[in-house]
Amino acid sequence: MIPLRCRAGIGDNPRSSVEKVRSREQPVRYGCASLANHDSQLSVRSALRRTPDAEVRKDADDEPSRLAYSLCAAMPRRCTTAGKSPVSLVERQDARFVGVVSAAPIRKPLPVGVEPNLRDYEAMRVAFSWGAARRALAGLPDGGLNIGYEAVDRQADGPFADTVALRFLRKRDAPSALTYAQLKAQTSRFANVLDALRVGRGERVFVLAGRIPELYVAALGTLKHGSVFSPLFSAFGPEPIEQRLRLGGAKLLVTTSALYRRKGVAEMRRRLPELEHVLLVGDQDEIAEIPDVHDYRLLMGRAPECYEVARTRPGEMALLHFTSGTTGTPKGAVHVHEAVVAHRATGQLVLDLRPGDVFWCTADPGWVTGTSYGIIAPLTLGVTCVVDDAELEADRWYRILQDERVNVWYTAPTALRMLKRVGADVAHEYDLGALRFIASVGEPLNPELVVWGQEAFGLPVHDNWWQTETGGIMIANYRSMDIRPGSMGRPLPGIDAAVARRDDEDEPVIAPDGSLELIEDPGEHGELVLRPGWPSMFRGYLGEEQRYRECFAGGWYLTGDLVRRDADGYFWFVARGNDVIKSSGHLIGPFEVESVLLEHDAVAEAGVIGKPDPVAGEVVKAFVSLNPDRVPDEALRRGLVAFARRRLGPAVAPREIEFVGSVPRNRSGKIVRRLLRARELGLPEGDVSTLEQES
């Protein structure tokens, strides 16, 4: 299982944290509340009125995943605090106070009347049902459901026809935009193109591109057509691209002429017989010189603007997201059209989106966050999405937040750390008064970043947790609730989360009756587990049924992440339960990197881990054992890095390579990455009795 969130516990470096705070005795005020020590935990108290939401009622007609349940059965707002006395903000972890942090007062009040969508968490936990959330969607005749229809056609056929759906900002060219009506027309054209090319319902359409309009049109047009959309990260090297195209059984690929040449797509097509069509975006004359491809814009220009959306069933496959594995090939997580129920609900309840908002999700659409929350969730709510094609630059990002009047900003800790490096004063040069909510996902969000958000933006940063497999946000810090920096938050209404005990082999403890042994005491570490049945839950790994079944036990989905839960129901991340590397929001499987390094004629063995990094979260580090005839020197080290970058792309290739005599393996031949990580970080090596003798 590949987590989309991970975080270090607060107080990883208590001494430096305390010393830092002692040097600045500035009082703390938060926009939504004064800060107080609450039950020996950091608490940001909301001043909002909490009333039950009578519009959402409890239902009993939910239709959770039959497959998941059968598997389980088979397996034994914000208001200012001006005028109030400041209070200290105290952090606590594992019964120890580990530091005091502070933040600047609110600079600007929130516009009057903007209350949170989720006003009372406890009341919503009782009132919420997935059945009611489903009825908030339009649906299709005879119980059908289609993500593309809910995100595009429903809005275009209603009051949002002339509302900008997608606004594209470019570093070099003028900005452009698509209204919901225009998006409906363009996605209908693309669906007609798929028909003309005889792409069948359920067949896979891959898109390899940056943040260009054609990507969004292709994604939504594919969903309207009833075929399956699968995004590819444009920074991938040739091998990860080919591997995913093969595993996914790609029928059609949309990419740019530049990426087609740079990634060697022409060569890999010879090895991909199922890939029948390639549509290229780019200069018409350049495309005309490339054999056996289609010009995307020519085909779109000939296609009709009307299309009857496919009457897909809720459980019909819609999305294929690849997530890296630790001991094998990437896994293709299958998601269905019913996922849109959770996308819309979490957009409302977690991200606090509402019609008319301007929303900026900075995630690349090549990753699941960029699809679920960069495309689907906001569009189902009639929101305007900002899309920027440039890399992070502090002044540019702040100008976007200012000029586009962004209301809700969903970003990653890596970006926030880079902004923090240039200082909060830079943010104060811009009018960011339109912002009412900031959320973060993808990697560790330490407590200081939460507080720094208050200093820089007048708002704290709200962390949340989910995985590729969960398809949507599962645990979050909500706008109306207390914030405990360093915490993942509390489960989404409609989600049952628990902590399961693990044995000495890091496996869940299963009782004689087949149930999981759950941990009830607060503060004790265990594996985070979720009760299956939410709409966006993955329905399988493509072609790997057994691998999917192993994700469930005792009636629960096993996330693979270790957590603890405090007395108030807040979850805190402890450690990963697998070896997947998270670098700048990218999920990297070590096996994939090791395999490429082993193709170099100098390499005998390779083991890869994630090394902590203050900006990227982690960077890829490889330990390489050379063949006897090769000498470990700096030239070879640089050559190996360059070799890996050519094959994997800079986002995946190792940042560091260390030559070693041998790579530790257990007696079954599996690389013991735990030991590599322990040696790198100077941690205890633990039990080494199962290791092969190292040379």
Residue ranges and their predicted role:
Residues D162-V164, L280, D285, P291-H294, ...:
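Conserved pre-ATP/AMP-binding loop-to-beta segment of ANL
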Residues V341-C361, P365-V408, R421-V422:
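Conserved AMP-binding/adenylation subdomain of ANL enzymes
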Residues P175-L178, N192-F236, A363-D364, L587:
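Conserved AMP-binding/adenylate-forming
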Residues D295-R297, V406-T411, K420-R484, L492, ...:
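Gly/Ser/Thr-rich phosphate-binding loop
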Residues P491-G494, D504-E550, I588, L683-E685:
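Conserved ATP/PPi-binding loop(s) of AMP-dependent carboxylate-activating enzymes
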Residues S176-A181, R311, A318-A342:
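Conserved AMP-binding A3 loop
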Residues D94-L110, P116, L220-L298, A412:
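Structural core segment of the AMP-binding/adenylate-forming
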Residues E239-R246, L253-A258, Q402, W409, ...:
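AMP-binding/adenylate-forming catalytic core of the ANL superfamily
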